[in-house]
């Protein structure tokens, strides 16, 4: 979901890290089936070792499904909204490299997060690459190695 400024006025968080535990987001249920291209990305991520996938709930209504969450253990990898927008929870170095290479936009409401849309078939490969980079980062791969995968 592409955030609207008015929607997020009270949680403007660009100067802090957002660390949200899966259990704080609402009832833990299997992820929903998404539209065609976002679903292809979701299915790929769910195959990866130690990934926890669950329903992503609406920020303001914990009974309204809003997409699919992905965690590596207790660390958030990112989530895909029902409309195909992805919010990816990266760190400073990785987000800067992603933004520099124009692979995503800066998520305006959380430091070091990036966002992008999965709207067409060509977006699937890029989305999987970005989720994979973040997955590898959370698994301890050195930042220089990750950045070299972007600068191919």
Sequence positions of predicted segments:
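Charge-dense, helix-prone N-terminal extensions
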Residues: 2-152
């Amino acid at each position: 979901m592409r955030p609207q400024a008015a929607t997020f006025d009270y949680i403007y968080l660009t100067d802090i890290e957002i660390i949200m535990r899966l259990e704080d987001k609402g009832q833990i249920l299997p992820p929903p089936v998404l539209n065609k291209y976002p679903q292809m990305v979701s299915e790929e991520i769910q195959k990866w070792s130690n990934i926890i996938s669950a329903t992503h709930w609406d920020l303001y209504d914990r009974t309204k499904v809003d997409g699919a969450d992905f965690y590596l253990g207790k660390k958030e990898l990112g989530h895909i909204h029902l409309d195909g927008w992805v919010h990816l929870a990266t760190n400073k170095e990785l987000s800067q490299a992603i933004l520099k290479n124009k692979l995503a936009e800066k998520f305006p409401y959380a430091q070091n997060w990036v966002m992008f849309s999965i709207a067409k078939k060509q977006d699937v490969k890029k989305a999987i690459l970005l989720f994979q980079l973040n997955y590898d980062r959370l698994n301890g791969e050195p930042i220089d190695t990750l950045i070299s995968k972007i600068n191919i």
